[in-house]
């Protein structure tokens, strides 16, 4: 047995006993092949090891079998082995160039690989660059994509809003034509131009005015027919209106009874003894005075009752709203018609002059008699009361929704 010593370690060889050389180490396994479509992995750089010093030739070594080429004898690390010297620092460009010249392809930048090699080398270089970047760039990529998607989503929303603004909508319920036919009943233009007929009728009944609150144009509303008695709806009235109605009703009943009794006492042959009695003559004077008071009460409170009747009539009539006609509007303006008077007496004058009411509706004696009496009582009111009503410019038709 002979021992050969060297600077980097010791090597054992059994020349005398005929021991064979130790078996060579198996070659390292090949790197795993990446699936198609993914970049090739970057192999790790080989660790730096200093070269072993050449050992002197000995007779045993010369007599022994020759070692095959390409095999490296195993090294035994000892205490005398020195650590590898540190690598010298090189600029980034030189390091990349040196790596490219030495055959270490994975350290090549994508630009250099694309300029130097084919598409395979550029893909490998791009894959190595992505691996060297690591997972730190993924949030940035996602944020860019998310910002692009959010910006595209915001653009779609703005486009949707602009498309909605171009569609005509009702200025009362803010719905489109799918809820009903849209009308143009007044001079308003733009986004407040159109409205549904049912929405406008409900707004007129609740607001109590035939005019538009924006352009002050009187709607062309016509009465079609009265509802059936089973479809009549009640309206809400205030306490003052209730007192006024009760006073007018009681005054009317007392006036009718008093006038009837006075006429019977004056012309009946069976009341001769009453006309001669002094007590009945005093009663005649008192009844005459009370009749005058009742007439004044009815005239004073008749307008309030008339307004309540108009409200009830507006609720229990079928109305139709006409579209705005510019030619008619110009013609009415040229004639100098007062919108206040037309608005105040619209249900009476407009319907009679244009013959828009059905012959069987509101023209029968049972409706016409009371309607004309209330109208006459309202005309007999003092002028200051009429001026107060005309100053408002609206039909008092305040009706709550039922």
Swiss-Prot record:
Recorded GO MF terms: ubiquitin-protein transferase activity; zinc ion binding
Span of the annotated motif PDZ-binding: 399-402
ZnF start-end (RING-CH-type): 162-222
Region (Disordered): 1-161
Catalyzed chemical reaction(s): S-ubiquitinyl-[E2 ubiquitin-conjugating enzyme]-L-cysteine + [acceptor protein]-L-lysine = [E2 ubiquitin-conjugating enzyme]-L-cysteine + N(6)-ubiquitinyl-[acceptor protein]-L-lysine
Keyword Iron-sulfur included in the entry's annotation: no
Compositional bias (Gly residues): 1-11
Entry keyword Transmembrane: yes
Subunit structure: Interacts (YXXL motif) with AP1M1. Interacts (via PDZ-binding motif) with LIN7A. Interacts with unidentified fucose glycoproteins.
Superkingdom, natural source: Eukaryota
Cellular component terms (Gene Ontology): cytoplasmic vesicle membrane
This protein's name: E3 ubiquitin-protein ligase MARCHF11
EC number: 2.3.2.27
Entry remark concerning the domains of this protein: The RING-CH-type zinc finger domain is required for E3 ligase activity.
Taxonomic lineage of the native organism: Eukaryota, Metazoa, Chordata, Craniata, Vertebrata
InterPro entries reported in the protein's UniProt record: MARCHF11_RING_CH-C4HC3, MARCHF4/9/11, Znf_RING-CH, Znf_RING/FYVE/PHD
Binding site for Zn(2+) 1: 170, 173, 196, 199
Record field: compositional bias (Pro residues): 21-56
Regions of compositional bias (Low complexity) in chain numbering: 111-124
SMART domains per UniProt: RINGv (SM00744)
Sorted UniProt keywords: Cytoplasmic vesicle, Membrane, Metal-binding, Transferase, Transmembrane, Transmembrane helix, Ubl conjugation pathway, Zinc, Zinc-finger
Functional note: E3 ubiquitin-protein ligase that mediates polyubiquitination of CD4. E3 ubiquitin ligases accept ubiquitin from an E2 ubiquitin-conjugating enzyme in the form of a thioester and then directly transfer the ubiquitin to targeted substrates. May play a role in ubuquitin-dependent protein sorting in developmenting spermatids.
Membrane topology: Multi-pass membrane protein
Motif YXXL motif in this chain: 371-374
Binding site for Zn(2+) 2: 186, 188, 212, 215
Subcellular location: Cytoplasmic vesicle membrane
């Amino acid at each position: 047995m002979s021992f050969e010593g060297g600077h980097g370690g010791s090597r054992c060889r059994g020349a005398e006993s005929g021991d064979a050389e130790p078996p060579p180490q198996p070659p390292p396994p090949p790197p795993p092949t990446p699936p198609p479509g993914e970049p090739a992995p970057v192999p790790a750089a080989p660790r730096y090891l200093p070269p072993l010093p050449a050992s002197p030739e000995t007779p045993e070594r010369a007599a022994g079998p020759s070692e095959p080429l390409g095999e490296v004898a195993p090294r035994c690390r000892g205490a005398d082995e020195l650590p590898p010297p540190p690598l010298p620092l090189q600029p980034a460009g030189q390091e990349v160039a040196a790596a490219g010249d030495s055959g270490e392809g994975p350290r090549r930048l994508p630009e250099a690989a694309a300029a130097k090699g084919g598409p395979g080398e550029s893909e490998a270089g791009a894959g190595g660059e992505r691996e060297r970047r690591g997972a730190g760039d993924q949030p940035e990529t996602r944020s860019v994509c998310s910002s692009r998607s959010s910006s595209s989503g915001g653009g779609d929303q703005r486009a949707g809003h602009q498309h909605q603004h171009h569609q005509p909508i009702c200025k009362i319920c803010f719905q489109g034509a799918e809820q009903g036919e849209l009308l143009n009943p007044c001079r308003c233009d733009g986004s407040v131009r159109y409205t549904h007929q049912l929405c406008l009728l409900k707004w007129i009944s609740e607001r109590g005015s035939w005019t538009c609150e924006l352009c002050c144009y009187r709607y062309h509303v016509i009465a079609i027919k009265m509802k059936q008695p089973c479809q009549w709806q009640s309206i809400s009235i205030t306490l003052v209106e209730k007192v006024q109605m009760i006073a007018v009703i009681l005054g009317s009943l007392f006036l009718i009874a008093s006038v009837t009794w006075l006429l019977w006492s004056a012309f009946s042959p069976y009341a001769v003894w009453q006309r001669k009695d002094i007590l009945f003559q005093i009663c005649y004077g008192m009844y005459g005075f009370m009749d005058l008071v009742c007439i004044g009460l009815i005239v004073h409170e008749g307008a309030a009752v008339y307004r309540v009747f108009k409200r009830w009539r507006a609720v229990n009539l079928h109305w139709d709203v006409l579209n705005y006609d510019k030619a008619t509007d110009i013609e009415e303006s040229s004639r100098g018609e007062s919108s206040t008077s037309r608005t105040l007496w619209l249900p009476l004058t407009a319907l009679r002059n244009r013959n828009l009411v059905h012959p069987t509706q509101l023209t029968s004696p049972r409706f016409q008699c009371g309607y004309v009496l209330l109208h006459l009582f309202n005309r007999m009111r003092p002028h200051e009361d009429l001026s107060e009503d005309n100053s408002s410019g609206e039909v008092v038709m305040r009706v709550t929704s039922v």
